[in-house]
From Swiss-Prot:
Subunit structure: Part of the 50S ribosomal subunit.
GN (gene name): rplF
Protein's name in the database: Large ribosomal subunit protein uL6
HAMAP family in alphabetical order: Ribosomal_uL6_B
Organism of this sequence: Bacteroides thetaiotaomicron (strain ATCC 29148 / DSM 2079 / JCM 5827 / CCUG 10774 / NCTC 10582 / VPI-5482 / E50)
GO CC terms of this entry: cytosolic large ribosomal subunit
Summary of the function given for this chain in its UniProt record: This protein binds to the 23S rRNA, and is important in its secondary structure. It is located near the subunit interface in the base of the L7/L12 stalk, and near the tRNA binding site of the peptidyltransferase center.
Domain of life of the organism encoding this protein: Bacteria
Gene Ontology biological process terms from the UniProt entry: cytoplasmic translation
Length: 189
């Protein structure tokens, strides 16, 4: 039995969890999410809690894989419950001279030192806001109820200019620590 998988998930007020044909659907004030669950995992919804257990009747080639599925699907369902009730938020910081970000609806325009600006069309589920204050690095604030989708979008934006180790220029998460390198040491033999 998975250590993560055996923990019950409490359902907050205003959130409903339903199970139909191995698909768990979670509805809440921030939106609706659904996730397929492998038949090797049983899902029980009772007394304001969701519990996942390994299905003893369902056979999988590798028993360790069943333990892995147990923890995986518990984490996915928990992320869905938190997402539709509270939502997820990530902030990206643009570090570099002349780096700018602006948005119009769900389209972000990035000026990252290339000869052209980069336009990124975001999914409808992700809300975006950009902040540019004088003498501060521009920020891109992304919010969504889907943790996986939010992470993928942030990773895609960050991939256009990853932070480099010498000056730290690039797109980084707020609070992320970039491992720095010293430059060439001139004259050292």
């Amino acid at each position: 039995m998975s250590r993560i998988g055996k923990l019950p998930i409490s359902i907050p007020a205003g959130v409903t969890v339903t199970l139909k044909d191995d698909v768990v659907t979670v509805k809440g004030p921030k939106g609706e999410l659904s996730q397929y669950v492998n038949p090797a995992i049983n899902v029980a919804i009772e007394d304001g809690h969701v519990t996942l257990t390994e299905n003893e009747k369902e056979m999988i080639d590798n028993p360790k894989q069943k333990h892995a599925f147990h923890g995986l699907y518990r984490s996915l369902v928990h992320n869905m419950v938190v997402g539709v009730s509270e939502g997820y938020k990530k902030e990206l910081e643009l570090v570099g001279v002349g780096y700018r970000a602006s948005n119009q609806g769900n389209i972000i325009e990035l000026a990252l030192g290339y000869t052209h600006n980069i336009f990124i069309q975001l999914p409808a589920e992700v809300k975006v806001e950009t902040k540019s204050e004088r003498n501060k690095n521009p920020l891109i604030i992304l919010e969504s109820c889907d943790k996986q989708l939010l992470g993928q979008v942030c990773s895609k934006i960050r991939s256009f200019r990853k932070p480099e180790p010498y000056k730290g220029k690039g797109i980084k998460f707020v609070g992320e620590v970039i491992r720095r390198k010293s430059g060439k040491s001139a004259g050292a033999k």
